């Protein structure tokens, strides 16, 4: 479904450094992949390339990114727009940034339908919005539909963004650190929603995170990035039990355990 080959991205403000340096991987239909690494490792830039969000005025890039054979780099913006929201959707880290603060959330959820299926009427469109909201774990749908973003909690806002991404039933969902700003309970709910969407709808998901424990809880395959490159790629269980790269080993060692928490408490006294 998705083929990334020798992707390299360099921002014009940093002409001597590649933000992404030779990234290649293949994703099959319905796969659930975790893309993990520290801040600045290139994972979000890779996601921007996959979703057709890179702009030539900001960066130069090489390689190919193909979704169902359609090139996502160096292609007509109308072609990219026809894929975004239909075959491909993105859930960003900060929902308050992704959502329009002066617009009720209902019409924002419906936006992909309005753009790509203008023939669908208001009643049917609202029905599709409610279905997507329910799939995203929202309740009291009529009330939420008519709220403004600032009237909802962080967890509910992220569910709204997931609903907006799901309404057109994309084949690939890129979730760019969707749980980072949430408390652990809400985080677990969002992860459960993503896993259910993958299982029930067959939606391929790329989960981007700096938290290896979160990615391991959700994904069957993990890709580890460091300094713009992929340093490890394989089944989650194998990587967690027998990592080969030193950076991956360091990420695993950084995962909190009860023993580490107790040790920190003792050291603080």
Mark where each language-model region is.
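ABC ATPase "signature
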Residues: 233-234, 242
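A short, surface-exposed alpha-helical micro-motif characterized by mixed small hydrophobic
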Residues: 215-217
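Conserved ABC transporter NBD signature motif
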Residues: 59-71
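Conserved ABC ATPase "signature" region
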Residues: 71, 123-143, 252-253
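A short, proline-enriched helix->beta-strand linker immediately N-terminal to the Walker B motif
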Residues: 167-171
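Hydrophobic anchor residue at the start of the ABC signature
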Residues: 109, 162, 186, 190
């Amino acid at each position: 479904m998705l083929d990334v080959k020798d992707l390299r991205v360099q921002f014009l403000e940093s002409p001597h450094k590649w933000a992404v340096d030779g990234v290649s991987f293949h994703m099959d239909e319905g796969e659930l992949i975790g893309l993990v690494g520290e801040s600045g490792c290139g994972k979000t830039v890779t996601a921007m390339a996959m979703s057709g969000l890179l702009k030539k005025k900001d960066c130069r890039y090489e390689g190919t990114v193909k979704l169902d054979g359609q090139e996502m780099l160096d292609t007509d913006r109308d072609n990219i727009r026809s894929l975004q929201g239909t075959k491909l959707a993105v859930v960003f880290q900060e929902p308050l940034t992704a959502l329009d603060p002066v617009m009720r959330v209902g019409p924002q959820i419906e936006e992909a339908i309005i753009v790509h299926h203008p023939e669908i009427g208001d009643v049917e469109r609202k029905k599709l919005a409610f279905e997507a909201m329910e799939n995203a774990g929202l309740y009291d749908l009529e009330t939420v539909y008519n709220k403004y973003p600032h009237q909802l909690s962080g967890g509910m806002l992220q569910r709204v963004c997931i609903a907006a991404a799901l309404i057109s039933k994309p084949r690939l969902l890129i979730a760019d650190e969707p749980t980072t700003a949430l408390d652990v309970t809400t985080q677990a709910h969002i992860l459960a929603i993503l896993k259910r969407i993958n299982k029930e709808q067959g939606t391929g998901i790329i989960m981007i995170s700096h938290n290896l424990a979160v990615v391991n809880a959700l994904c069957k395959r993990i890709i580890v990035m460091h300094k713009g490159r992929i340093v490890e790629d394989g089944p989650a269980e194998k990587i967690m039990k027998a990592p080969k790269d030193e950076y991956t080993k360091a990420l695993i060692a950084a995962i909190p355990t009860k023993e580490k928490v107790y040790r920190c408490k003792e050291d603080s006294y």
